Amino acid sequence: MISRLLSLLCLRLCVGQTDIPENGSPPKPSLSAWPSTVLPTKSHVTMQCKSPTPSKYFILKKEGFALNSVKPYNLTEETADFHFTDLRQNDGGHYTCEYYSKWPHDTPSHPSNALFLLVTGYLPQPSFQAHHRGTVTAGSKVTLQCQKAGSVLGPVKFALLKVGHSTPVQTRSSTGMVSDFSLQNVTARDSGEYSCVYYQAKAPYRASGPSNLLEISVIDNHLPQDLAASTFPPQLTATSPKTPGTMTEGYTVDNLIRVGVAAAILLIVGGFLVEAWHSERLSPNKPW
């Protein structure tokens, strides 16, 4: 058993050594952000740098300048987190991370791919609409239009956002007032709530607040029309929050149904128990 463990350990160390390219630099890490790379001012974000090999420490850089260095926090020594609180406009920009490998000693890696962080809320909100309304079937094309505020001059970039995605779905550069985003050959995975923002293409990357949400539901065109209509909600409609009264009413009806069913079951079970007890009392004693 011990010899097997030693063999596995030797294999791991050998693999770690062979992960280093011939030029002496370890493979580049990956950099991600949670909950998103597009966040409102005064919010929080965590950037995570992950290396493919055990590391001694990690460095986070913004626009090429080092901001912070931390040691890995997990047992595999392959991950480090960088926390930002109370985000401001000047926190926006391009970030990369690097790590120093343990084998060979203190060998710096190549930088990760750049991660663009956008802090919103410094320009007027855009308008957001669909070019058409009605049923959206799988395989069709959906075009969404984002329009910046008329008071904002100069070229900007537009970003299409989707609830639940940590990065923009699409980005577009534009010298005009509007930008169109096309979703080609949509599937059920494209269903969801979308919004858009626009921002300056250069530092300090001033960005608007997000537009109102627009909901897209994609219907499978292989389903019968009556089944599809009963299974999916209306398509391409702006979302409207449920009122507390409507939600409370639904919960009350459901609770009454549950209580009624439970009471009926208890009455039936109680009847069986009473009948069994009564029969036991009337039956003669059996000899031993």
Swiss-Prot record:
N-glycosylated. PROSITE patterns: IG_LIKE. Residues 17-258 are extracellular. Expressed in lung, uterus, lymph nodes, spleen, thymus and bone marrow. Expressed in bone marrow CD11b(+)Gr-1(+) granulocyte precursors and mature neutrophils. Disulfide bonds join 49-97, 146-196. Its main location: membrane. It is a single-pass type I membrane protein. GO terms for cellular component: plasma membrane. Keywords: Adaptive immunity, Cell membrane, Disulfide bond, Glycoprotein, Immunity, Immunoglobulin domain, Innate immunity, Membrane, Receptor, Repeat, Signal, Transmembrane, Transmembrane helix. Residues 1-16 form the signal peptide. It is found in: Cell membrane. Induction: Up-regulated in CD11b(+)Ly6G(+) and CD11b(+)Ly6C(+) neutrophils upon S.typhimurium bacterial infection. Up-regulated in CD11b(+)Ly6C(intermediate)Ly6G(high)MHCI(-) neutrophils and CD11b(+)Ly6C(high)Ly6G(low)MHCII(+) inflammatory monocytes in response to TLR4 ligand lipopolysaccharide (LPS) stimulation. Interacts with Fc receptor gamma chain FCER1G. PANTHER family: MHC CLASS I NK CELL RECEPTOR, T-CELL-INTERACTING, ACTIVATING RECEPTOR ON MYELOID CELLS PROTEIN 1. May act as receptor. Negatively regulates TCR-mediated CD4(+) T cell proliferation and activation, possibly by binding an unknown ligand on the T cell surface. Enhances Toll-like receptor-mediated production of pro-inflammatory cytokines by macrophages and neutrophils. This is T-cell-interacting, activating receptor on myeloid cells protein 1. It comes from Mus musculus.
